Each structure stands twice: as structure tokens, then as C-alpha cells.
Amino acid sequence: MGLFKPKLRSDIQDRIKEIDPRVFVSIPHVNGLPIAENTLCQIYYTDDNLFIDGSGQSFNLSNEKISAIEIKTDVEIQKQYVSSVAGGITGAIVFGPLGALIGGRVKEKKIKNTTRYLIITYTSDNEIKYLGFDITYTPKALEIIKLFNKNNLNKNIIEL
């Protein structure tokens, strides 16, 4: 990640001018659309609609059909066992063969991978459906949630 934004393709620039979104992000698709997983999608959020372009297809979701836009965080912890050659050599020099055994012993190393997903819940044909996108490296996607929540404060009230 650098200080400069990458230059957008001309077709994406034209689409931004056409739609005039409040928020625009490019993020990988995870599930919910009839396109391949990890396909890079352009999402244009306006006050009325959510437009999604990906894999040569365009999708339009009215904000009235959207019931929630949320973030789900998935944490995966991997354990790796590594031995230290340098520790073994240093141990051998300082303490002899016993030092080599202690210095070069196998150690457990934990790697924590955190993945963040943008989950869009909507209703289609009287059925609740979901769209999922990977936003681990796209903090700007949080703006979509803020705008949606700001514009839909009383929407989730259910009349009994």
C-alpha cells in the first residue's frame, strides 16, 4: 500500500460519472452472486441503490430491499513448529552438545490471520439472501455501513 491511489480503468471512471455514488470500492466477491469466488467487484453505493459490477455482469440492488449491512470477522490461528539452526549453533559454541540440543529445539510459532467480510442481507422473492465480500484490505468499505445505518434508522421496526 503506497501513498498514491491506483489509476482506475476508463470504464470504471465512466461508470462512476454515470452513477455518482456516495461510496465506491473495489473488493473481492466471496458469495451470493452468480460469479466466481474472489472475482474483483466494483461496488457503487448511492442513496437509493447498491450497484455491483463484476465478471462482466452488472447487478442492481435497491436499498429498500436491504435489511442489513454488517461486518463479520473471521480469525484463523495456525500453529507452525520451527527449529532454530542459529540457536543450535550458538548453543553448541557456548555449551557444547547439550547446548546445541537446547538451542536448536523445536518451537511452536502461532500465526493469526484475520479476515473481515462485508455481509449484505437483503430480501428477494420473499426470501432472505446474503452477499459476501472480503474487505480485509479495504477499510473504505466501512463508509457503506455508516451511510446505510444513517439512512435507515427506523427501517428495521417490525409491526406486530
Language-model features: where?
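Acidic, Ser/Thr- and proline-rich intrinsically disordered linker/docking segments
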Residues: 2-12, 69-160
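Short, surface-exposed beta-strand/loop "edge" segments at domain boundaries and coil↔beta transitions
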Residues: 51-52, 57-61, 126-132
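Anionic N-terminal interaction surfaces
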Residues: 1-49, 55-58
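Phosphoinositide-dependent membrane-docking surfaces
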Residues: 50, 60-77
